[in-house]
């Protein structure tokens, strides 16, 4: 069924979907990792593809920037296309000294400054956590490949351009490994919809060290994260 934001037909998506924020990253994954990949949606230049990875049917669909955008696509994929498992593959910032650019972080749970979860959870705090078994699959996938990962909590923010030293100090004190703009919202919606979800991000910005990844690398130099995620999706199907 065509939705206001996705023009794929029923059955065009696998029940397992990788979701980067960047449409160009979705295209990169489809071209470089999936066999016989076809474009199944392109409304508003939000690209989605379905193909085969090691014989298994996998889809990749971009979700845009921020909680509101990402929740639109997650909701429609689950409600209209019967998606059961989603891995968000993105980039994130950090304020943790031992974390560096290009390091990979698997997110266990995410706090947020967004009002979205409170609006949906009757003004109460919602515990936004990943699916345990999908986290375990990501961990085992990385371990099998010998790829170093970090596992910990995220802070999801509505504001990309903001200077708040007190907040950064708090994130350090609570050992918040990653800062992004989507995970807390995606985790809460996945809980409501009853699907498996996890978020894995490559560090693109170190806020304290004032170091950042180039825009080219943000599109295409995330191969370890992509490989871990694809392997995790098929781990129990082998």
From Swiss-Prot:
One of its GO terms (biological process) is purine nucleoside catabolic process. Catalyzes the reversible phosphorolytic breakdown of the N-glycosidic bond in the beta-(deoxy)ribonucleoside molecules, with the formation of the corresponding free purine bases and pentose-1-phosphate. Belongs to the PNP/UDP phosphorylase family. A purine D-ribonucleoside binds at residues 5, 180-182, 204-205. Phosphate binds at residues 21, 25, 44, 88-91. GO terms for cellular component: cytosol. One of its GO terms (molecular function) is purine-nucleoside phosphorylase activity. The record marks 218 as: Important for catalytic activity. Homohexamer; trimer of homodimers. It comes from Buchnera aphidicola subsp. Baizongia pistaciae (strain Bp). This is Purine nucleoside phosphorylase DeoD-type. PROSITE patterns: PNP_UDP_1 (PS01232). The keyword Glycosyltransferase applies. The gene is deoD. InterPro entries: DeoD-type, Nucleoside_phosphorylase_CS, Nucleoside_phosphorylase_d, Nucleoside_phosphorylase_sf. It is an enzyme of class 2 (transferase). Keywords: Glycosyltransferase, Transferase. It catalyses: a purine D-ribonucleoside + phosphate = a purine nucleobase + alpha-D-ribose 1-phosphate; a purine 2'-deoxy-D-ribonucleoside + phosphate = a purine nucleobase + 2-deoxy-alpha-D-ribose 1-phosphate. The active site is at 205 (proton donor). Its EC number is 2.4.2.1.
């Amino acid at each position: 069924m065509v939705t206001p934001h996705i023009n794929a037909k029923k059955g065009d998506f696998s029940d397992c979907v990788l979701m980067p924020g960047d449409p160009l990253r979705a295209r990169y994954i489809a071209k470089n990792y999936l066999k016989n990949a076809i474009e199944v949606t392109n409304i508003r230049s939000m690209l989605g593809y379905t193909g085969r990875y090691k014989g298994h049917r996998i889809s990749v669909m971009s979700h845009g920037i921020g909680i509101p955008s990402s929740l639109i696509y997650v909701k429609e994929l689950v409600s209209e296309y019967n998606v059961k498992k989603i891995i968000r593959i993105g980039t994130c910032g950090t304020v943790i000294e031992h974390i560096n650019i290009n390091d990979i972080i698997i997110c266990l749970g995410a706090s947020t400054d967004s009002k979205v979860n409170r609006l949906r959870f009757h003004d109460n705090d919602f515990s936004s956590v990943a699916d345990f078994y999908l986290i375990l699959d990501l961990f085992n996938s990385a371990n099998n490949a010998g790829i170093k990962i970090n596992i910990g909590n995220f802070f999801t923010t509505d504001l990309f351009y903001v200077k708040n030293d007190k907040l950064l100090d708090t994130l350090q004190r609570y050992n918040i490994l990653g800062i992004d703009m989507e995970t807390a919202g995606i985790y809460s919606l996945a809980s409501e919809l009853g699907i498996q979800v996890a978020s894995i991000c490559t560090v693109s910005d170190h806020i304290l060290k004032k170091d950042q990844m180039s825009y080219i690398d943000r599109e295409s130099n995330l191969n370890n994260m992509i490989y871990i995620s694809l392997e995790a999706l098929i781990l129990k199907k082998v």
